[in-house]
Each structure stands twice: as structure tokens, then as C-alpha cells.
């Protein structure tokens, strides 16, 4: 039910959503707040895909792996329309990790990874928004007027111990200071010490979760947990990197 609701919300975004001037229609504006359906859809998708893959392990079970892949393609397609290729990549990554844990052949996973890279190249050539984001990230000379430039400067200004609580300036320059660039804000005010603590905390959560899942015998719990941890870890690395 949660997946169905999230899928409908994602499908209606091009008609009822807003981009807040950022070039990608990813949110619903509620006036007092905004909602990004993909954030709710990801865990629901993982649970559904895990259930399908686990059911496929029964002798008389459904073709869960194929069905879960088809569902993943639907989700990725809706995300590409926004366009939100980052979230689409996370969905495919989470599905790929679950498929690997479910016993997928390595050769097939390599082929799927190659197809994903090819799709990324096509997206780069087809989407000006996506190409601009990639070019900005890979540019050897970072433009200090971009969000990435502001964030990098904030981290440098923070040093080891930071400039002090509430003394940071980058939060006034970044529209996403409270989400995508929260680490840059924290690094400027609290320094590298806090950043290293946050990284260690994320690493501890991921390692502890994987250790627990390695001992799990229920295939559904093992697959769902692995998919959730994979997306959690990948998104943390992207936002902190």
C-alpha cells in the first residue's frame, strides 16, 4: 500500500509538483513544508523487492526477481522524468545489492552494471540539468559561486575545530543548507572533529547492521535489511562526499 501510494505521488509530480527554481520537479509544496515522494518510495520499494525475491526462492514461488526488476525500471523511469538521476541510481544500486545477496550470477550483475553506465551516458547527453551537475562536480577549477564552491570553502574555513556555534556564514548562501549540504554547515561551525564523528557514527550503524544481517536466516529480512542498509550507506557517502 505504501509503495502504491508513493508510486502514484511520483507519477503525478510532473503535473502537480514544483521545482522551487532548481530545474527538477521533485517536490510537492504544502505551503508550510515540502514533500519529496522519492524519499518515501525508496524504503517501500526495497521491502517490496525483498518480498518478491524471497518468494522466488520457494519451489512454487513467483518469478520474483524478474518482477522486482520490472518494478525497479518503472520507478527509475518516473525518477528520470523529474529528472532525478541520483535517486534513480540509488534505487538501481539497492536492487542490485539485493539481487546479489539473493544469489544472482556475477556475469549478469556485471552486464546490468554496464547497462546502467550506458544509461548514465545517455542521460548526460539528453538532460542539460544532469550534464550541468556532472560538469560542475568534475570541473578542475571549482566556481566559488556555485553551491559546491560555497560548501568547499565552508569546510576549509572550519578547519579542525570550526569557527564556533552559529558563527558560520555558508548557511546563508546555500538553499539546501539544511539537507544536502548540512555537513558543510557543520564542518564550518564545528570543524573536522564533528565531521569525523559523524562519519564514524554512520560507519558503525552500517557495520552493525550488516553483522546482524549476516546471522539472519529469514530470506525476506536479510534481503530487505541489506537493501535498506545499502541505500542508507550510499546516500550518506554521496551527501558527505
Question: Where are the regions that the model predicts?
Answer:
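Hydrophobic alpha-helical transmembrane segments of multi-pass inner membrane proteins, especially
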Residues: 1-144, 187-241
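Alpha-helical membrane-protein architecture signal
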Residues: 70, 144, 148, 161, ...
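Generic alpha-helical structural context detector
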Residues: 135-136, 153-156, 184
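Extracytoplasmic/periplasmic regions of membrane proteins
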Residues: 148-164
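Long extracytoplasmic/lumenal interhelical loops at the membrane interface
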Residues: 159-193, 213, 220
